[in-house]
């Protein structure tokens, strides 16, 4: 992430936009990281890749690259996004959902920025033009001491205390729309552990 960020920053003044070719398995992680490392960019930073390699006769690489360039050249494109399978998705909202299909990525809890059909970019209207109110901001570090914990039924609440020595923060991936264990001895222990994190 930092190397990609550095290359973009080094060439930012000399280019109108950027297209980054990337493997699909970790592309959404890179897009999210770049979205926080490079904020309020009036220039587009587009990530793309393919499900099948360029040499495959049925590859999606050429179309994805073409559509990414088309999107990056559009005057209304800005910030970090993924263009893949005819869809432009905000960098902070993309998730790889399918491992075989050409429409591999979905936009989580937010509509796609745009669809690309027959050389036309059809925008959803919610992700407007860059207003230019804030200059682009570059950040040069990411705290590696952040842990993402996916809660599962029966999770041992002691895991939060075990993580406290090695991490500065824990992001809880909770049930449904934010539910955490509440009842019984396990629920109480879990909530106490959360309060210890909040108070520290």
Where do the language-model regions lie?
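ATP/NTP phosphate-donor binding region
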Residues: 1-10
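Accessory alpha-helical/coil subdomains and C-terminal extensions
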Residues: 90-183, 190
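Short coil/turn connectors at secondary-structure junctions
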Residues: 13-17, 40-44, 75-79, 84-85, ...
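Internal gly/pro-rich beta-alpha loop/helix module
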Residues: 47-117
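Short beta-strand segments
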Residues: 20-22, 46-49, 81-85, 150, ...
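Short acidic, glycine-rich surface-loop motifs adjacent to enzyme active sites
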Residues: 12-27, 166-180
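Short amphipathic alpha-helical segments and helix-helix/interface helices
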Residues: 35, 69, 160-161, 191-198
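Short Gly/Thr/Asp-enriched flexible loops that form oxyanion-binding sites at enzyme active sites
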Residues: 20-42, 182-193
């Amino acid at each position: 992430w930092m190397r990609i960020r550095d290359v973009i920053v080094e060439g930012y003044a000399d280019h109108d936009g950027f297209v980054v070719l990337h493997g699909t398995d970790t592309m959404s992680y890179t897009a999210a990281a770049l979205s926080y490392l490079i904020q309020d960019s009036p220039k587009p930073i587009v990530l793309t890749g393919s499900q099948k390699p360029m040499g495959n006769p049925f590859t999606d690489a050429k179309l994805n690259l073409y559509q990414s360039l088309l999107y990056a050249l559009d005057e209304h494109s800005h910030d970090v996004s993924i263009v893949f399978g005819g869809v432009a998705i905000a960098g902070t909202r993309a998730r790889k959902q399918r491992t075989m299909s050409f429409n591999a990525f979905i936009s989580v809890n937010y509509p796609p920025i745009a669809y690309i059909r027959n050389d036309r970019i059809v925008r959803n209207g919610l992700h407007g033009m860059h207003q230019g109110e804030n200059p682009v901001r570059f950040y040069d570090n990411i705290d590696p001491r952040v842990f993402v914990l996916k809660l599962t039924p029966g999770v041992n609440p002691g895991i939060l205390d075990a993580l406290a020595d090695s991490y500065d923060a824990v992001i809880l991936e909770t049930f449904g729309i934010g539910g955490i264990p509440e009842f019984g001895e396990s629920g109480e222990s879990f909530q106490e552990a959360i309060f210890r994190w909040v108070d520290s």
